[in-house]
UniProtKB/Swiss-Prot annotation:
GO terms for cellular component: cytoplasm; Holliday junction resolvase complex. It is found in: Cytoplasm. This is Crossover junction endodeoxyribonuclease RuvC. The active site is at D11, E71, D144. It is an enzyme of class 3 (hydrolase). Its cofactor is Mg(2+). GO terms for molecular function: crossover junction DNA endonuclease activity; DNA binding; magnesium ion binding. Homodimer which binds Holliday junction (HJ) DNA. The HJ becomes 2-fold symmetrical on binding to RuvC with unstacked arms; it has a different conformation from HJ DNA in complex with RuvA. In the full resolvosome a probable DNA-RuvA(4)-RuvB(12)-RuvC(2) complex forms which resolves the HJ. CDD domains: RuvC. Pfam families: RuvC. Its EC number is 3.1.21.10.
Length: 168
């Protein structure tokens, strides 16, 4: 049985979807992969969602995570933006569910609190703490990738995460 847990964090967006993969080794968080899924800007929304879905499926197939963590949707005054973001979250969840991966959701403020110690941390503070927690030589960029890594770290710190539940 493996005692390593792999977590895929995702910060959804129709233009940029950040991803971050970490592995838990004992009490250490080890960065595995991070970056962004960027559908071409000239694509129609339906095509962008397909690119996001395929990108997430590739990440799941490549890294075999034990959990997928998605940022919850914030309340937006712009209904159109909220709907588009909700649909991006939906295709991410479908990709994970199709492969039988458990899905967890956390608010941005919860991830910031877990990583920085305050739910009102700036993007810069999140990048800096993610860099320190994962022993990266430079802060992870773009911000979307740092946010995705923060979500994965947040989940790794949750009491619901019991190593035995993820042993393979």
């Amino acid at each position: 049985m493996s005692n390593q847990v792999i977590i895929l964090g995702l910060d959804p967006g129709t233009k940029i979807t950040g991803f971050g993969v970490i592995r838990i080794e004992g009490h250490q968080y080890v960065p595995v992969d991070y970056g962004c899924i960027r559908p071409p800007s000239h694509y129609k929304l339906s095509e962008r969602y397909l690119v996001i879905c395929q990108g997430v499926e590739q990440l799941i197939d490549q890294h075999q995570p034990h959990a997928v963590v998605v940022e919850t949707q914030y309340v937006s005054k712009n209904v159109q933006s909220a709907m588009k973001l909700g649909m991006a979250r939906g295709v991410i969840m479908i990709a994970a569910k199709k492969r039988g991966i458990p899905i967890y959701e956390y608010a941005p403020s919860k991830a910031k609190l877990a990583v920085v110690g305050t739910g009102r941390a700036s993007k810069y503070q999140v990048q800096g703490m993610v860099q320190r927690l994962l022993n990266l030589s430079i802060p992870p960029t773009p911000e979307d990738a740092a946010d995705a890594l923060a979500l994965a770290i947040c989940h790794a710190q949750m009491p619901i995460l019991k190593q035995s539940q993820y042993e393979t």
